């Protein structure tokens, strides 16, 4: 996420507005303890702060089990603000592991061309970019499909508008992100399970239309309460719609790995894992 001046003041205003808007939030499930055994899939969404983040360090910690307790069966990284100038390093990181990578540039900030990327330990099929309605800057999502235990899942990395319209009907408005969320959802399969991660810039909290729209479509998503950015803001999310009998847990990684955002880690457990009681 990129900011101009006055970030602290803006954060305070947005947190107040979020508290007022929270009564309209979508229902998310509350989870108990995770099932025993290693996860079948580890999914991380992370805004790399215009390429400044230490991606090799993050991948190393995932592979060595420091973040997931034990090495996960497979890994999918959903990255935002990767930069075209370092795309070769991204592809090299994937190539030496036999992984797949897809990067689509979207915005040039005068120094670097930023974009979204997917890196997957599973073969990534049908990778493409999806252009979103433009507000202040160009925005897109990247998507593709992977297969886990003979089950196909779509995966998406996206980055929504980071500004709001002020004082519409007396409140800050999230119309721009709402329009982008609607456009992205129209492009995604409706009869196929999938995972969407990204920097949704949900400054106004759970009552934001983008948050509610994705929570409704991806109703296996664990509750998101831990801040991912300064000022106590929850901007980054992993939304999941899983096959019958699968389950997931989500947590925010304490280390930012030189970015200004915390990575968000979702562990997906296949149908052979013990299910957990959950309330919705």
Where in this protein do the model-derived segments appear?
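Soluble or luminal CAZymes and related metallo-dependent hydrolases
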Residues: 54-58, 85, 136-138, 173-183, ...
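Active-site-proximal segments of metal-dependent phosphoesterases and phosphodiesterases across multiple
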Residues: 159-184, 202-216
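Active-site environment of divalent metal-dependent phosphoester hydrolases
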Residues: 51-53, 84-87, 109-111, 163-166, ...
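Sec-dependent N-terminal signal peptides
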Residues: 7-16
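Structured beta-strand-rich core segments of catalytic domains in phosphoester-bond hydrolases
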Residues: 78-161, 246-248, 252-256
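N-terminal, active-site-proximal structural segment of metallo-dependent hydrolase catalytic domains
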Residues: 2, 14, 20-96, 108-113, ...
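Metal-dependent phosphoester-hydrolase catalytic domains
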Residues: 26-33, 129, 187-195, 201-280
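Active-site beta-strand/loop signature of hydrolases that rely on acidic residues for catalysis
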Residues: 40-48, 62-90, 119, 144, ...
């Amino acid at each position: 996420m990129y900011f101009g001046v006055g970030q602290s003041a803006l954060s305070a205003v947005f947190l107040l507005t979020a508290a007022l808007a929270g009564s309209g939030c979508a229902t998310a499930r509350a989870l108990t303890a995770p099932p025993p055994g290693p996860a079948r899939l580890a999914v991380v969404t992370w805004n790399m702060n215009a390429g400044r983040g230490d991606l090799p360090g993050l991948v190393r910690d995932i592979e060595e089990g420091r973040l997931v307790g034990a090495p996960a069966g497979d890994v999918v990284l959903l990255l935002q603000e990767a930069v075209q100038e370092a795309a070769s390093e991204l592809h090299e990181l994937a190539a030496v592991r036999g992984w797949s990578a897809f990067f689509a540039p979207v915005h040039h900030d005068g120094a670097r061309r930023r974009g979204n990327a997917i890196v997957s330990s599973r073969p990534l099929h049908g990778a493409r970019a999806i252009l979103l309605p433009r507000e202040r800057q160009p925005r897109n999502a990247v998507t593709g499909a992977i297969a886990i235990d003979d089950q196909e899942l779509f995966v998406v990395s996206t980055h929504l508008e980071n500004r709001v319209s002020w004082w519409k009907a007396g409140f800050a408005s999230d119309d721009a992100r709402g329009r982008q969320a609607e456009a992205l959802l129209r492009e995604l399969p409706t009869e196929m399970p999938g995972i969407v991660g990204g920097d949704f810039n949900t400054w106004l909290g759970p009552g934001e239309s983008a948050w509610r729209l994705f929570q409704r479509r991806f109703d296996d998503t664990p509750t998101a309460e831990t801040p991912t950015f300064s000022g106590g803001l929850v901007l980054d999310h992993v939304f999941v719609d899983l096959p019958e009998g699968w389950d997931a847990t989500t947590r925010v990684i304490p280390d930012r790995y030189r970015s200004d955002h915390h990575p968000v880690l979702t562990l997906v457990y296949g149908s052979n894992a013990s299910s957990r009681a959950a309330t919705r």
